[in-house]
Design a protein with these regions (language model features):
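Bacterial Sec-dependent N-terminal signal peptides
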Residues: 1-22
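Acidic, contiguous N-terminal accessory segments
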Residues: 16-154, 392-394, 398-401, 405, ...
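Feature activates predominantly on carbohydrate-active enzymes
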Residues: 52, 94-317, 322-327, 331, ...
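Flexible loop/turn segments at secondary-structure boundaries
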Residues: 56, 164-166, 192-198, 283-289, ...
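Structural detector of well-ordered beta-strand residues that form the stable sheet scaffold
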Residues: 186-188, 277, 347, 399, ...
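Active-site neighborhood of glycoside hydrolase catalytic domains
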Residues: 289-295, 299, 307-414, 418-430
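Flexible, acidic glycine-rich loops studded with aromatic residues
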Residues: 397-403, 408-413, 419-554
Length: 554
């Protein structure tokens, strides 16, 4: 019997030593020890952690092993003679932030990070060395990995306004980001289509603003609706009674997160070293807010309703009044938001505001006159600067979509460039941090294929285009390029109604994004990435992720 077991282990060791190491994102350096036996994880393997700050990484690994391999390991401070996974923090191993070394032998695994973050990222690479099938011997190939991130900001966004997703799925989404070494989660909490965060001072935001009476059927403009021009251009308001009649499915949709639930999600993300950036949209995209508090609009006597169709709702006037009353309201909202979220960054939107409504508002015109503002673009800048001053007074920094450049950029603002790269380039040239998220490649709600399997936004962002995106524009010199903080994928949910559809739209484009942001530029190779994806897909099968399987056809 012993001889049979020995031969079995020898066969396993040859199989593992010969296997390819397919990690996404691609590490900076990998040395495969092809002649060495694998490290075998069994019930006697221990996770060694002497530094208490590394416990979250140990717990994450242990939870993963238990969930997918039905194996729970002992966590200890004492290093045994062999058969252990040791987590260590040592700032001297690399000049790079959040770097790590990962060394596996047949006796043990040693993970050394320059920080607790680096250790956590090493754990994610270690997980990708595990078998993609649960019911077999858990072997890890002998390897040395030396790695570090390329960009400091590695972000992913989720819109929960157009369609609401519960706490359990938001946590799952955060796990997806963690497994891909992402470190920022942009949580789009408010928009025309629903207000999703409890604000205790203003309960009607969730009593009224969190619910809509229906959603259009199919692609915009929706089944039975005319393709009306609904985006207001400067000096142009053409709206008829028929424009306001929208046919929908008549199904009430909504939901919101209580502040206690927000805290629960924040705690969950913190243990995965992901910073959550909340977005509170202003001055436009405010139909849900105005449905609850119409007095804050430029037409205070109008009956607003939470939006039931997609796209920009500025034809129906979704812009907040530029008044002291509005500013005080927003300050109170942001106070509660900032008290909840430890993030040093607060996203305040700033996009797609139809300034024509300010042009026709006596109150807004008076605000312009009182502050020496000549144009409505300057009023937008004043609006953003005023909110920035308040946010800065609380020790935090604002992020805004690239429209916040209009009329002059607020002094400390970070620009999120979605309308191509122009906004990011302009911000970097003004010595402001920029996050690149151009919609043609970074919007994962777009179709992945010319003929999609299911309903998706009528734009095309295939995997190869995502993978080949380079966040640093060639127009910038070396000094300006330092202000490109990183990039972000965005997932808008007009046509994404279930967790399975989120997964389908996200994977494998999130894999491509992670490699853009983590791996050295000279390590990126699309054919090699495609090869590594085959192993990643097997892992997704193990995890029950509904990825886009059409990529397996190629």
């Amino acid at each position: 019997m012993k001889k049979i077991i020995f031969l079995f282990l020898v066969l396993i060791s040859f199989k593992v030593s010969a296997q390819e190491i397919n990690i996404i994102p691609q590490p900076a350096y990998i040395d495969k020890k092809q002649t060495q036996k694998p490290f075998i994880i069994d019930s006697k393997t221990q996770i060694v952690v002497a530094d208490s700050t590394l416990i979250p990484s140990a717990d994450f690994l242990n939870d993963y092993l238990q969930k997918y391999y039905k194996l729970k390991l002992t966590i200890t401070k004492v290093t045994p003679g062999r058969n252990f996974i040791k987590l260590i923090s040592n700032t001297r191993i690399s000049e790079f932030n959040d770097a790590y070394n990962l060394i596996t032998t047949d006796q043990n695994t040693t993970i050394i990070g320059t920080s607790k973050f680096g250790v956590f990222y090493a754990v994610q690479s270690f997980i990708q060395l595990l078998p993609t099938v649960a019911n077999q011997l858990i072997t890890v190939p002998s390897v040395v990995i030396v790695d570090h991130p390329r960009f400091d900001y590695r972000g992913m966004h989720l819109d929960v306004s157009r369609h609401f997703f519960d706490v359990a799925f938001v946590k799952q989404y955060i796990d997806y980001l963690a497994l891909h070494k992402m470190n920022y989660f942009h949580w789009h909490l408010t928009d025309d289509h629903g207000w999703r965060i409890e604000i205790k001072k203003y309960p009607k935001l969730t009593e009224i603003g969190a619910w809509r009476n229906g959603s259009i059927i199919g692609l915009w403009p929706g089944k039975g609706n005319k393709n009306i021009r609904y985006q207001v251009m400067p000096n142009e308001i053409k709206i008829t009674p028929n424009d306001a009649v929208i046919k929908t499915d008549g199904i009430r949709h909504g939901g919101f997160y209580t502040q206690e639930q927000i805290k629960e999600v924040l705690d969950y993300a913190a243990k995965r070293y992901i910073t959550i950036i909340p977005e509170i949209e202003m001055p436009a995209h405010s139909m849900a807010l105005l449905a609850a508090y119409p007095e804050l609009g430029t037409e205070p006597n109008k009956k607003y309703t939470v939006a039931e169709t997609w796209g920009m709702m500025n034809k129906y006037n979704n812009v907040l009044q530029a008044s002291d009353t509005t500013f005080k309201f927003l300050e109170n909202v942001l106070t509660e938001v900032m008290d909840l979220f430890p993030s040093p960054y607060i996203h305040i939107g700033g996009d797609e505001a139809a300034k024509v409504w300010w042009k026709q508002s006596a109150v807004s015109q008076q605000m312009m006159k009182a502050n020496g503002l000549k144009t409505e673009s300057e009023l937008q800048s004043y609006f953003i600067r005023r909110m920035e001053k308040f946010v800065n007074s609380k020790g935090k920094t604002i992020i805004g979509w690239n429209e916040i450049l209009q009329g002059g950029l607020a002094p400390n603002a970070v620009v999120m460039s979605w309308q191509g790269e122009k906004g990011g380039i302009e911000a970097a040239r003004q010595n402001h941090k920029a996050i690149m998220t151009p919609e043609n490649t970074m919007y994962f709600n777009h179709r992945q294929f010319v003929k999609e399997d299911s309903l998706a936004a009528n734009k095309f962002s295939p995997l190869i285009d995502v993978y080949n995106y380079e966040p640093i524009p060639t127009e910038l010199n070396a000094e300006q390029a330092k202000y490109i903080w990183g990039a972000q994928g965005c997932l808008w949910t007009e046509y994404i109604t279930t967790p399975a559809k989120v997964q389908y739209q996200l994977f494998p484009r999130l894999d491509a994004l992670s490699e853009i942001l983590w791996s050295p530029k000279d390590k990126r190779n699309y054919p090699d990435f495609q090869k590594r994806l085959k192993t990643q897909f097997k892992r997704y099968d193990l995890m029950g992720i509904t990825y886009s399987k059409r990529y397996l056809e190629n």
